[in-house]
């Protein structure tokens, strides 16, 4: 994971890219057993922090993104690039890797 000294407000995704703050992974099982870091699953849910301007169509126009800042999304398990800003973890991914908006 790349450790960089940026802030969320300075990250501007390009094209159809979406910058998502990763939700915290579960610390313990339903039975109360604490999980070590090596046993935790990579989270697939997060909150959209920044959105690019959208994908370019063949005619040069932009297709508006289907997600917006603040949306809670479910994304593909191995999608995107992991980025750590301070103590928070983010993933920069293509909009096509977002599977659903979670209400």
Curated annotation (Swiss-Prot):
Keyword Chaperone: yes
InterPro entries to which the protein is assigned, alphabetical: Chaperonin_GroES (IPR020818), Chaperonin_GroES_sf (IPR037124), Chaprnonin_Cpn10_CS (IPR018369), GroES-like_sf (IPR011032)
Domain of life: Bacteria
UniProt cross-references to PROSITE patterns, sorted A to Z: CHAPERONINS_CPN10
Coiled coil: none
Subcellular location: Cytoplasm
UniProt keywords, alphabetically: Chaperone, Cytoplasm
CC annotations in GO: cytoplasm
SMART domains: Cpn10
Predominant subcellular localization, coarse grouping: cytoplasm
MF terms (GO), sorted A to Z: ATP binding; metal ion binding; protein folding chaperone; protein-folding chaperone binding; unfolded protein binding
Residue segments, region Disordered: 31-67
Biological process (GO), any one: chaperone cofactor-dependent protein refolding
The keyword Chaperone appears for this protein: yes
One family name in Pfam for this protein: Cpn10
Subunit structure: Heptamer of 7 subunits arranged in a ring. Interacts with the chaperonin GroEL.
HAMAP family linked: CH10
Described purpose of this protein according to its UniProt entry: Together with the chaperonin GroEL, plays an essential role in assisting protein folding. The GroEL-GroES system forms a nano-cage that allows encapsulation of the non-native substrate proteins and provides a physical environment optimized to promote and accelerate protein folding. GroES binds to the apical surface of the GroEL ring, thereby capping the opening of the GroEL channel.
Family: Belongs to the GroES chaperonin family.
Stated name of the protein: Co-chaperonin GroES
UniProt source species: Prochlorococcus marinus (strain NATL2A)
Gene label: groES
């Amino acid at each position: 994971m790349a450790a960089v000294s940026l802030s969320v407000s300075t990250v501007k995704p390009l094209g159809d890219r979406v910058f998502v703050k990763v939700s915290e992974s579960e610390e313990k099982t339903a039975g109360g057993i604490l999980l070590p870091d090596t046993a935790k699953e990579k989270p697939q849910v997060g909150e959209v922090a920044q959105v690019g301007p959208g994908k370019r169509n063949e005619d040069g126009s932009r297709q508006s993104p289907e997600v917006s800042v603040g949306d809670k999304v479910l994304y593909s398990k191995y999608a995107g690039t992991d980025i750590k800003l301070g103590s928070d973890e983010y993933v920069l991914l293509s909009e096509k890797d977002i599977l659903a908006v979670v209400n």
